[in-house]
Amino acid sequence: MIRIREAIIVEGRYDKNTLAQIVDAPILETSGFGIFHDRQRLALLRRLAETRGIIVLTDSDGAGFVIRNYLRGAIDPSQVKHAYIPDIAGKERRKRTASKEGKLGVEGMRPDVLLEALRRAGATIEGEETPAAGTRITKADLYAAGLTGGADSKAARQRLLAQLDLPEHLSTNALLEVLNALMTREEFQKLYI
């Protein structure tokens, strides 16, 4: 079991149960869209963000991104890290049919995939060194790499998302955030410019 400093925010109880088997960290549920109307739970998430930081780990479907974006606007962004699971087609064992978009959610991911998503997000893992921060990637770097502002930019971003095993719904700003968690500006320029 891996101990993580930050609290982890997931959508529901099955996500929480899956994660609790592999990490030792506070894990809280949003109760799906219930977080939109639960002021007390949101206040708790804000307090946790201030004291220990939080990691948002939602499904890679449209609903997961709605919840993630709500939290992004409701909690100080400097206290929040975002972990993204890859788009993997399938259905969870407990369900009769696949989800609306046909993708596995957090509860259906293998433990190694979840741990990798948390590491990519920059989780503070007890006993592991955190890499020193390098120069950050900017929107200008994305433009120079043809990932924004061009005729084929969307297709180029989709190829990059697939290459990095990231969800297809990732916005350009979220991609920038993930790239900064994965690599330095220098590493990005060597690979993509």
Task: Label every model-predicted segment.
Residues I85-A132, R136-K139:
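Activity-critical C-terminal alpha-helical subdomain
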Residues E6-A7, R13-N17, Q21-T51:
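Acidic, glycine-rich catalytic loops of TOPRIM or P-loop NTPase phosphate-binding modules used
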Residues P77-D87:
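Short, acidic/small-residue loops that bind anionic groups at enzyme active sites
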Residues E116-R119, A123-I193:
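C-terminal, charge/polar-rich interaction regions
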Residues G34-H37, L57-I67:
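Acidic, metal-coordinating catalytic cores used for nucleic-acid/nucleotide bond scission
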Residues I22-V23, D76-S78:
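Short, structured coil segments at secondary-structure junctions
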Residues V10-E11, T58:
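Short beta-strand scaffold positions
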Residues L44, G62-F65, N69-D76, D112, ...:
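Phosphate- and other anionic-substrate recognition elements at nucleic-acid/protein interfaces
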